[in-house]
């Protein structure tokens, strides 16, 4: 279908949705109803799918929930793995559609989440969308969607990072690394020592110091598994950002740009050794190659915003490669408004490059390689806004207070089980006679085992943003 035809179909369907009329033609179009007809919640919830959307679930629990959806709704779902991770976890895809209508008559929709392990609210949002579609599948509005669209939900692209984030918020995935050069990967992982259940960053100092992150960094909470004296110097992380490793404009920003505004920190140091080196990314790229998608959304956290291409450069009206960007810009604005309308929290939209320049992201890969309309929804920014600026939108929830605890040399020995004379910083400098360790635990690290307040509202708002995206695409 050419771009003009797609756009005309979009306009026609949009008009029908606004008027609340049914479309003539195929059965899938005839089933479409007005946006106001969306059910907010399922009429009935099977016991196996009675999910608390304000809870935090392990990856194994998410797998069980996906399996329950497939078991309860076999006529509209198919659950399969598209690949495995470094630690042999499956990358599950739940395909949702009316299987009685041929796939070539439908529009392909991708809902992908949690490429960054610690952004687990994104996984919850994708899971909720799948749950809502299956449990509401007898509703006339949802029936119309499933007649017209095939929806592919991959809720966790980074299962290894997801699981590691129950220990400490972990953005990368877990390709084995040997950070301290002892030829043993992950030989000194972060481990809780003081009984509070959280991982702390360690600073050297004195008991009467004012604790702050300006104190000299000493290490991370660990029992010194590798016995080299440096605490936490070989953690379970690759240091590589999977969302900088797709095979499109890979490593465009190299070391010469490292001092450019934010570019160096988010690109050349974290893009890996080559594009698509990781099994998770290879699996996702193969999925996009073998499945015809018209639009996809990648769910994240960090800000509250809907982003669209490009990531690697600004929009150029004279460049034919940018022909679809005005459409995506308009759709992103509507998606952000839908999220804001449901949740009562602030959301905005912009091109990803305006947020900050990156390269080799999923949305650029999808649009650049396959002309797939592609969006990023950043579903959650923790805490409270204090500036009133649109770019400072927050979830307006109460986060735990950051925590500082001082351990003297005696307490390091007696409480933490470490020899204060045997531990050093990364430069080999030990503690002075009058020094101890300040343990700093961030608000984020105190949230590893629990979801933010009103996550149930968040996931519903994200659903509405996704439906707004979906309704912008012509069916068939």
Which residue ranges define each predicted feature?
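Bacterial N-terminal signal peptides that target proteins for export
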Residues: 2-12
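C-terminal motif of bacterial Sec signal peptides marking the signal peptidase cleavage site
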Residues: 20-23
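Bacterial signal peptide processing site
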Residues: 25-27
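C-terminal accessory segments enriched in acidic
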Residues: 29-55, 246-476
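A non-catalytic alpha/beta surface segment that caps or lines the substrate-entry region
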Residues: 44-96
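Solvent-exposed, polar/charged alpha-helical surfaces in well-ordered, non-transmembrane soluble domains
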Residues: 60-71, 127, 131, 143, ...
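Structural recognition of the beta-strand scaffold that forms the well-ordered cores
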Residues: 78-83, 90-95, 108-112, 119-122, ...
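Active-site/substrate-binding loop(s) of hydrolase catalytic cores
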Residues: 106, 120-124, 128-317, 442
